[in-house]
Amino acid sequence: AGESSNEAKGMWFGPRL
Protein backbone atom coordinates (compact mmCIF):
# COMPACT_ATOMS: atom_id res chain seq x y z
CA ALA A 1 0.00 0.00 0.00
CA GLY A 2 1.08 3.58 -0.63
CA GLU A 3 -0.05 7.11 -1.41
CA SER A 4 0.32 6.58 -5.15
CA SER A 5 -1.23 3.10 -5.03
CA ASN A 6 -4.87 2.21 -5.04
CA GLU A 7 -4.95 -0.82 -2.77
CA ALA A 8 -6.98 0.33 0.23
CA LYS A 9 -7.14 4.15 0.06
CA GLY A 10 -7.46 4.07 -3.70
CA MET A 11 -10.77 2.25 -3.46
CA TRP A 12 -12.24 5.12 -1.48
CA PHE A 13 -10.40 8.28 -2.54
CA GLY A 14 -8.48 7.59 -5.72
CA PRO A 15 -5.04 6.52 -7.00
CA ARG A 16 -3.29 9.48 -5.34
CA LEU A 17 -5.26 11.39 -2.71
Swiss-Prot record:
Entry comment describing in which tissues the protein is expressed: Expressed in abdominal perisympathetic organs and abdominal ganglia.
Presence of keyword Secreted: yes
Keywords noted in UniProt: Amidation, Neuropeptide, Secreted
GO biological process: neuropeptide signaling pathway
Disulfide bond residue pairs: none
InterPro entries assigned: Pyrokinin_CS
Molecular function terms from GO: neuropeptide hormone activity
Superkingdom per UniProt: Eukaryota
Positions where Leucine amide occurs in the chain: 17
Location in the cell: Secreted
Identification of the protein by name: Pyrokinin-5a
Family in the record: Belongs to the pyrokinin family.
One GO location term (cellular component): extracellular region
Job description of the protein: Myoactive.
